[in-house]
Every structure is written in structure tokens, then in C-alpha cells.
């Protein structure tokens, strides 16, 4: 079996005296589909924020392809280009079309060419069923459609 893409070992996170995550262990292997489920306030978002370098765990380790992500803090943008996250509030730019929302991070953060970013954005918008809405602004989309644009943006 190949090395896990993501390995979480004994991860804990506290905010003051409030323990949000305690001794979390799991791995994600190539081809896996993984769901994180739990009650409201159970730490799902905190776990994802730790994985995406938006929070620092209190203890434990997160390995990405066998490397501890603590050692790649300076390369957070490069790491995040492989580990996407869709927020509960989709954080789409209201003045931009669905297509532009999916391109902006690629051109500004990842420094891809506009042509490359557009091709990637179109590919993922197609995959999530949003190709007919590439020119629509977020105000013209339903909540579910906005979510699909946010997913395409995370994948692109």
C-alpha cells in the first residue's frame, strides 16, 4: 500500500481551557473519499483549519505525503494549492462572475497565466455542473450553486 496523502497523529487543539480536539488520529490514502461528521461545535471546522494551516494545533502532527506541515509554514501557499477548503460562508467576490471567482486565486496566489487559470476553472465548473453559469455573479446564484462555485474554486 502506498504512503498516505494525509496522516493526522494525536492532534489536539485547545482555546484557553476549552479542549476542542483531543487525540485525533486518521489517515487519507490515495483514492479515499473521507467525510468529517459531527455535531455543531464538535471541532470539524477547527480540524480542517489546522489541516489548512489556518490554526496551529496544541499538540500532535499533521503529515502531508510523509512530511510534517509544521516545516512548510514558509510554503503555506504552495501547500494550500494542494489542500483546498470550502468555508461555510463561501466568500465569493460579489463583483466577479463564477468563472472569475475560480480564476482569481490561481492568477494572484499561484501565479498561473490567465489562460491556464481559465482552463482549470472551466474544467472544475463543468465537473460541479456550473458550466452554464460561468458569467453569473453570486447574487444571481442559489445557495447550492454558490457552494458548487466555491468547491470548483477550491479544486482549481
Where do the language-model regions lie?
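ABC family nucleotide-binding domain
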Residues: 3-156
Amino acid at each position: 500500500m502506498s504512503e498516505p496523502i494525509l496522516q493526522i497523529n494525536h492532534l489536539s487543539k485547545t482555546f484557553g481551557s476549552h479542549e476542542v480536539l483531543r487525540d485525533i488520529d486518521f489517515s487519507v490514502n490515495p483514492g479515499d473519499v473521507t467525510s468529517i461528521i459531527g455535531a455543531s461545535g464538535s471541532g470539524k471546522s477547527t480540524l480542517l483549519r489546522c489541516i489548512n494551516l489556518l490554526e496551529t494545533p496544541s499538540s500532535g502532527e499533521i503529515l502531508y505525503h510523509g512530511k510534517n506541515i509544521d516545516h512548510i509554514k514558509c510554503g503555506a501557499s504552495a501547500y494550500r494549492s494542494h489542500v483546498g477548503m470550502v468555508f461555510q460562508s463561501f466568500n465569493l467576490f460579489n463583483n466577479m462572475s463564477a468563472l472569475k471567482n475560480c480564476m482569481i486565486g490561481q492568477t494572484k496566489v499561484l501565479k498561473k497565466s490567465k489562460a491556464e487559470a481559465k482552463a482549470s476553472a472551466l474544467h472544475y465548473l463543468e465537473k460541479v455542473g456550473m458550466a452554464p453559469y460561468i458569467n453569473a455573479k453570486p447574487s444571481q446564484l442559489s445557495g447550492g450553486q454558490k457552494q458548487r462555485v466555491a468547491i470548483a474554486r477550491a479544486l482549481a
